């Protein structure tokens, strides 16, 4: 049982003190969802092994009354298993599979393109002692030896291409307050973590001012006394479109179902064209 209702969390921070890791972000939300206070152990990309006493080279890591738990997904499952009397993060194995699908979809749709658009900002905002490591590791492991500067260059042409790909996500949130239904759950926290990561490094906004995602994002950032409102975060909204850029989202003119079509409420839903009388010979 968590001593004094507090669980220790090893963070991954930028120079501003803002959390950068989406995995740490969703663990922060998971702990708050369960009603725990969080004892943050600060730190950046380097020195994780030393901070965790040789237990891990990656974060998040939590310590619950002496019990060490690694990996954000494992941590969430651990919290539900150990504290079933508190609000649940998951509701059964089927929901877990759907969450994993959404998580993978967001990473391929948004995180991948945005990573390349903000990779130099990512480096510049890191702790000074981390920057050599960030440059070397990202250039060698993720960018095939390309320089950060070369990869980020031209992002003004690429940023407008991402918002239209998020339309399926907008359609879901147009039908429900939270991904978890009436209340948020780990699906919301995992998805919010993508945008929290983006806000930590995005010196140029990735979304337009009028993006319908704003409502869900604002409510999500405000959860748990403004957990997502760190002064080191950058604005997500304010992307300026140029002539020829694609429309950032579909502007709904009426109620829509999950597939973007009008809800079927009976024969009156389908408006058939008037029948034209055939001319007599």
From Swiss-Prot:
One of its GO terms (molecular function) is hydrolase activity. Its main location: membrane. One of its GO terms (cellular component) is plasma membrane. Residues 11-87 form the GST N-terminal domain. Residues 244-281 are annotated as: Disordered. It is a peripheral membrane protein. PROSITE patterns: GST_NTER. This is Beta-etherase. It comes from Sphingobium sp. (strain NBRC 103272 / SYK-6). The lineage of its organism: Bacteria, Pseudomonadati, Pseudomonadota, Alphaproteobacteria, Sphingomonadales. The gene is ligE.
């Amino acid at each position: 049982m968590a001593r004094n209702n507090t669980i220790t969390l090893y963070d991954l921070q930028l120079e501003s003190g803002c959390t950068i890791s989406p995995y740490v972000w969703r663990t922060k939300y998971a702990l708050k969802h369960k009603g725990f206070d969080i004892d943050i152990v600060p730190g950046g990309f380097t020195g994780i092994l030393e901070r965790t006493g040789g237990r891990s080279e990656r974060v998040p890591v939590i310590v619950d009354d002496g019990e060490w738990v690694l990996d954000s997904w494992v941590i969430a499952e651990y919290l539900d298993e150990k504290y079933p009397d508190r609000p649940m993060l998951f509701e059964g194995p089927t929901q877990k599979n759907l969450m994993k699908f959404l998580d993978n979809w967001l990473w391929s749709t948004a995180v991948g393109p945005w990573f390349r658009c903000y990779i130099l900002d990512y480096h510049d905002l890191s702790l000074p002692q981390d920057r050599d490591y960030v440059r070397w590791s990202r250039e060698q492991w993720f960018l095939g030896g390309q320089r950060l500067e070369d990869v980020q260059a031209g992002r003004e042409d690429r940023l407008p291409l991402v918002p239209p790909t998020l339309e399926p996500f907008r359609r879901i949130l147009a039908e429900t307050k939270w991904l978890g239904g009436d209340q948020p759950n780990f699906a919301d926290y995992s998805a919010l973590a993508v945008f929290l990561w983006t806000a930590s490094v995005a010196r140029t906004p990735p979304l337009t001012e009028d993006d319908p995602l704003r409502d869900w994002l604002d409510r999500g950032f405000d959860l748990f006394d403004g957990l997502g409102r760190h002064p080191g975060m950058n604005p997500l909204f304010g992307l300026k479109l140029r002539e020829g850029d694609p429309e950032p989202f579909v502007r709904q003119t009426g109620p829509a179902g999950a597939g973007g079509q009008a809800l079927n409420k009976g024969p009156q839903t389908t408006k058939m064209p008037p029948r034209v009388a055939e001319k007599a010979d």
